[in-house]
């Protein structure tokens, strides 16, 4: 097969390059959808367990059919993925270990069983453990789907395309049930949606997705595509539909950017895509507006300052003596460092809560009102009392 060459605005690509990116995009979208629900259910590690433990299913399927292209391999691998989930839950329900420990016990055992089966009984067969882990997208376009001599394109693209269509169809049919069972299993049962059925349905889709992407991209990239985009989206929004779209967007971007990074530095395509996914998540983790590390640290710093301000205002409210309201009192009696005292005073002046005359601090009318409302909020915890303060003060935003 002689590759065709395409040129778009001086960017020259051969047909295998386009097909590699299409396969990566389809895999990214197919992984992002179940990945969102796994992250929301705090089951991110289960995707790693499934991606490794399906190996025995593939090997057993090959022993039965002697055909690496048989659909039975996919079915048995998906079944092995479900068995993994059941085993993890059985161990977890004993109460002796937590979920992450149960996962750590189950998937290495199943994966090693698969490796031993290959080593002992399938040495002459193309079942490469390294390819299972890392995949090799560069070769995916050369495994073609041929029907009656007609070349229909890369087999991986068709397999993952079918998996993606099934995933999207199930998402549309059961979106409401998935949403309710994810956030409130009790309400789901009350409304007649079995959370157990939804749970194992999600696990089945996750298993089939992992199996479908297994040969093309490898276990490591599948896990990265399931978890990293969803985790990044989780830090950016609380809306489920937006989270799905953002997760898909991150996955597609990482697939394309990762391919061109690999092309630029002559490295593993799957490894480069996983690296880009890590960089994307790190960027969101640091700079997300509400949940990012920098935003959280800034908010905590502001809240500490505002707690100090509120403490100072309560002190002023309780003391009318000038010596108790003198600026020097901040350092001597409240035991604040000079920088902290200056920061608190500046915040109070900025919000017109205090005035300073001859280094004696007094509450303004607004300061008196603020202090009384804050006290009432502390006692009653009724949000309506401090609703108008939330725009100016981190302290009351929760």
Where are these regions (language model features)?
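Short, amphipathic alpha-helical interaction segments positioned at domain boundaries
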Residues: 365-398
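Short amphipathic alpha-helical interaction segments
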Residues: 334-350
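Short loop segments and helix-boundary regions at transmembrane helix junctions
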Residues: 36-127, 234-245, 262-266
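Transmembrane alpha-helical segments in multi-pass inner-membrane proteins
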Residues: 212-267
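Helix-loop-helix "hairpin" substructures at the membrane interface of multi-pass membrane proteins
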Residues: 152-223
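Membrane-interfacial amphipathic/re-entrant helices at transmembrane-helix boundaries
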Residues: 2-30
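Short acidic, hydrophobic short linear motifs in intrinsically disordered regions
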Residues: 322-334
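Transmembrane helix-bundle core of multi-pass membrane transporters
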Residues: 111-170
């Amino acid at each position: 097969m002689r590759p065709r060459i395409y040129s778009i605005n001086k960017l020259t690509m051969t047909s295998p390059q386009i097909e590699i990116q299409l396969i990566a995009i389809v895999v990214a979208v197919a992984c992002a959808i179940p990945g969102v629900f796994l992250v929301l259910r705090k089951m991110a590690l289960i995707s790693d367990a499934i991606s490794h433990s399906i190996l025995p299913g593939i090997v057993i399927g090959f022993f039965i059919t002697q055909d690496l292209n048989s659909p039975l391999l996919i079915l048995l691998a998906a079944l092995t993925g479900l068995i993994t989930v059941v085993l993890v839950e059985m161990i977890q329900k004993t109460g002796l270990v937590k979920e992450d420990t149960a996962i750590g016990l189950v998937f290495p055992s199943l994966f090693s069983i698969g490796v031993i089966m290959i080593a002992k009984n399938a040495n002459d067969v193309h079942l490469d453990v390294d390819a299972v882990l890392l995949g090799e997208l560069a070769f995916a376009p050369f495994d073609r789907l041929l029907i009656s001599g007609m070349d229909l394109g890369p087999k991986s693209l068709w397999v993952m395309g079918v998996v993606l269509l099934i995933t999207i169809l199930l998402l549309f049919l059961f979106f409401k049930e998935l949403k309710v069972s994810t956030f409130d299993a009790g309400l789901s049962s009350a409304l007649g949606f079995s959370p157990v059925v939804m749970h194992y349905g999600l696990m089945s889709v996750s298993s089939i997705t992992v199996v479908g992407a297994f040969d093309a991209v490898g276990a490591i990239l599948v896990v990265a595509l399931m978890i990293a985009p969803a985790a990044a989206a989780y830090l950016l929004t609380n809306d489920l539909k937006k989270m799905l779209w953002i997760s898909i967007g991150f996955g597609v971007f990482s697939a394309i950017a990762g391919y061109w990074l690999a092309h630029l530095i002559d490295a593993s395509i799957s490894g480069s895509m996983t690296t880009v996914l890590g960089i994307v998540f790190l960027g969101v983790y640091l700079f997300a507006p509400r949940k990012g590390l920098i935003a959280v640290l800034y908010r905590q710093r502001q809240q500490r300052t505002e707690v100090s301000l509120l403490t100072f205002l309560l002190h002023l409210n309780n003391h009318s003596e000038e010596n108790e309201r003198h600026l020097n009192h901040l350092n001597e009696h409240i035991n604040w460092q000079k920088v902290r005292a200056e920061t608190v005073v500046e915040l109070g002046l900025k919000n017109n809560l205090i005035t300073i005359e001859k280094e004696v601090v007094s509450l303004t009318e607004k300061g008196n009102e603020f202090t009384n409302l804050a006290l009432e909020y502390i006692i009653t915890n009724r949000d309506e009392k401090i609703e108008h303060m939330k725009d100016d003060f981190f302290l009351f935003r929760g």
